[in-house]
Amino acid sequence: MYLKTLNLRQFRNYQDQKVEFTAAKTILVGNNAQGKSNLLEAVELLATLRSHRMTRDRDLVQEGEAIAQINATLERQTGVSDLTLTLRRNGRRSVALNGESIRRQMDFLGVLNAVQFSSLDLDLVRGGPEGRRNWLDTLLIQLEPVYAHILQQYNHVLRQRNAFLKRHVETLDATSLHSELAVWDAQLATTGTRVIRRRDRAIQRLAPIASAWHASISGSTEALQIKYLPNIPSEDNHPEEVQQAFLVKIQQRAIAELHQGTTLVGPHRDEIELTINQTPARQYGSQGQQRTLVLALKLAELQLIEEVVKEPPLLLLDDVLAELDLSRQNQLLDAIQDRFQTLITTTHLGSFDSQWLKSSQILFVKAGEIIPNL
């Protein structure tokens, strides 16, 4: 797949900017806070309808404006598509494909695929479980767009159940409380089981690919293991088994949930365990080794998406070369070559050899404006 054009209107610090991509690799050069990352974020939003910055739509709309719009033309083996995402300061976002409004956002997902790799991704190793869950969910949305709907359903039930626990614990008698809670329990178990099974399947597919990349980058001196640790332990990934285990655990934690007024059971408490040589990665070795792990994860994402969608996704590298030493930079640049269309942000061109610079489109970014290399 090849991103041909991108048009940003009133998005972040861009007033009205059109970019035409003329090479497999585009390097965006500029000082910090000029808008380089904002451009990559716009592409990520078209691919996943999520931002790794976890911002609200109103923060994406330029100050003083009511709406922001991201528009792109994308060439795939099946033909050229025109994608539009409209963000509103007050109100719901909307999407359109080839000029036609799309009601279900999951029908928009999967048209453009992209893998984002930024310095924030180092938190995958160092940070808490929520960051790893978000990372896995973003990958899953691209592998299986219906997952966005599945996750939305689960989160909706979770919010409702939490509200019920907070609101009614003190006001209802025991019989009414348990009968009403049983309805929410059943819905939580049904929707949660769908999330668990897909996360489990995704990790089973990703783990061996990431381990192979990790062995290659580390010269086979370190063994990476990725394990999915669902909050609901079950022997089998069969839906009935998982659902039953879910309901059993809810019963076990019922008193604690009533006491704390929140849901303590479900995939919103899952963990993805990363270990190097059987030691938790966050405790293991240097920042360099942690960066190797994240690089292996990102290369595995690229490979897995390509295997599933049968076309190479875009790669978005946000100021990440500065975070990698020379050997890891070369590993990454060698893996990319011209296989993936790549957008790279950097503050200077010193990280690239002359061959790379010759084969790349170089754009300069200053205060929300993009100037080609003249």
From Swiss-Prot:
It holds the Pfam family SMC_N. InterPro entries: DNA-binding_RecF, DNA-binding_RecF_CS, P-loop_NTPase, RecF/RecN/SMC_N, RecF_2. One of its GO terms (biological process) is SOS response. PROSITE patterns: RECF_1, RECF_2. Gene3D superfamilies: P-loop containing nucleotide triphosphate hydrolases (3.40.50.300), RecF/RecN/SMC, N-terminal domain (1.20.1050.90). Keywords: ATP-binding, Cytoplasm, DNA damage, DNA repair, DNA replication, DNA-binding, Nucleotide-binding, SOS response. One of its GO terms (molecular function) is single-stranded DNA binding. One of its GO terms (cellular component) is cytoplasm. ATP binds at residues 30-37. It is found in: Cytoplasm. Belongs to the RecF family. The RecF protein is involved in DNA metabolism; it is required for DNA replication and normal SOS inducibility. RecF binds preferentially to single-stranded, linear DNA. It also seems to bind ATP. NCBIfam families: recf. This is DNA replication and repair protein RecF. It comes from Nostoc punctiforme (strain ATCC 29133 / PCC 73102). The lineage of its organism: Bacteria, Bacillati, Cyanobacteriota, Cyanophyceae, Nostocales.
